[in-house]
């Protein structure tokens, strides 16, 4: 035989449970309040006992010495416990700040990783389109350069996003650039050194280089290297003649250079009639004949150089390539050599 539960009894039981639970909660709240009150009273009593113990210690009451020591000992322990709690609270605060900063850094790293994934995804997509072009003409020319530049920019953006210390790297790059600029400013300019070396090159070598370069620009001549070699050799002969002539006294050179072409014969006759300076009387006839023959040889070399230049010239050559044989200096030197040769001949015949 089964007995059915009465619904009214079940409701009463539930109501009793709720009432008992509520009553217990109220009692717990009252107990907590009483505990707080007792704790407060205990702290007040403890503070009062500590102050009284200090006063009794001042008066040196021997009767209450044990009580005073116990109170002071308890107070000292409580102070140590309080200091320990404060120290733990400070450490907890520091740890909390550290955890907060690490959480912030972790958030930034997650953001950087997300941006890095996006950039790598764009770079991968760009490289796929670059390596598999639809149009074959698109893989050449300006389009290829633009795509490569875009890929390079995306790669740099990815590296910049994933680098942990961007600011420090930028500062180091700026310092390196400043050091490079200072080194470049301190080092001598290569162009200035080259200009200084060019100033030290002799004039005859520059003329020789000009002749060789002017000949080398004409590709139609098959015998061009042979001709330039001969002209250079003749130029060396002319230079040697000029150097030997320049070793003579400076006053004779100026007199010979100042002779006009139209009055050359008159001046030669005057030189033949004029008396020989005393220093020429000291020379022997053999030495004069040797010097006259040497000057004649120099004159012959100059004339032969001019003849060679005329023989090897053709309409295709640049007229400026042999300009050094037709310069005013060369003409004046030739006139000076002729005048000096004839003056030596006149002086030798007069003796």
Swiss-Prot record:
Residues 192-202, 232-251, 264-273 have a biased composition (Basic and acidic residues). Expressed in brain and medulla. It comes from the Eukaryota. Residues 10-43, 69-115 form a coiled coil. Keywords: Coiled coil, Cytoplasm. It is found in: Cytoplasm. Residues 165-179 have a biased composition (Acidic residues). Residues 214-226 have a biased composition (Low complexity). Residues 174-261 form the Olduvai domain. Residues 157-285 are annotated as: Disordered. GO terms for cellular component: cytoplasm. PROSITE patterns: ODV (PS51316). The keyword Coiled coil applies. Encoded by one of the numerous copies of NBPF genes clustered in the p36, p12 and q21 region of the chromosome 1. Belongs to the NBPF family. This is Putative NBPF family member NBPF5. It comes from Homo sapiens (Human).
């Amino acid at each position: 035989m089964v007995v059915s539960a009465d619904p009214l009894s079940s409701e009463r039981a539930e109501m009793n449970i709720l009432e008992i639970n509520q009553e217990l909660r109220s009692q717990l709240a009252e107990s907590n309040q009483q505990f707080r009150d007792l704790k407060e009273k205990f702290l007040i009593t403890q503070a009062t006992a500590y102050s009284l113990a200090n006063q009794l210690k001042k008066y040196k009451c021997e009767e209450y010495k044990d009580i005073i020591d116990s109170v002071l000992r308890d107070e000292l322990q409580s102070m140590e416990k309080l200091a320990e709690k404060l120290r733990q609270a400070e450490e907890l605060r520091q740890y909390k700040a550290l955890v907060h900063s690490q959480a912030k850094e972790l958030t930034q790293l997650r953001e950087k990783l997300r941006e890095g994934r996006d950039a790598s995804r764009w770079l991968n997509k760009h490289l796929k389109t670059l390596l598999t072009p639809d149009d074959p003409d698109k893989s050449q020319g300006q389009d290829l350069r633009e795509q490569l530049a875009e890929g390079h920019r995306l790669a740099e953006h990815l590296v910049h996003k994933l680098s942990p210390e961007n600011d420090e790297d930028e500062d180091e790059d700026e310092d390196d650039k400043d050091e490079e600029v200072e080194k470049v400013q301190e080092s001598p300019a290569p162009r200035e050194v080259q200009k200084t070396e060019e100033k030290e090159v002799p004039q005859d070598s520059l003329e020789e280089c000009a002749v060789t370069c002017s000949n080398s620009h004409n590709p139609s001549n098959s015998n061009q290297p042979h001709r330039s070699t001969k002209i250079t050799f003749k130029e060396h002969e002319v230079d040697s003649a000029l150097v030997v002539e320049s070793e003579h006294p400076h006053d004779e050179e100026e007199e010979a250079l100042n002779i006009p072409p139209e009055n050359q014969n008159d001046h030669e006759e005057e030189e033949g009639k004029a008396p020989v300076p005393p220093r020429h009387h000291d020379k022997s006839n053999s030495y004069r004949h040797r010097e006259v023959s040497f000057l004649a040889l120099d004159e012959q070399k100059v004339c032969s150089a001019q003849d060679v230049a005329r023989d090897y010239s053709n309409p295709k050559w640049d007229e400026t390539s042999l300009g050094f044989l037709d310069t005013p200096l060369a003409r004046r030197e030739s006139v000076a050599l002729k005048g000096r040769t004839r003056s030596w001949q006149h002086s030798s015949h007069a003796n």
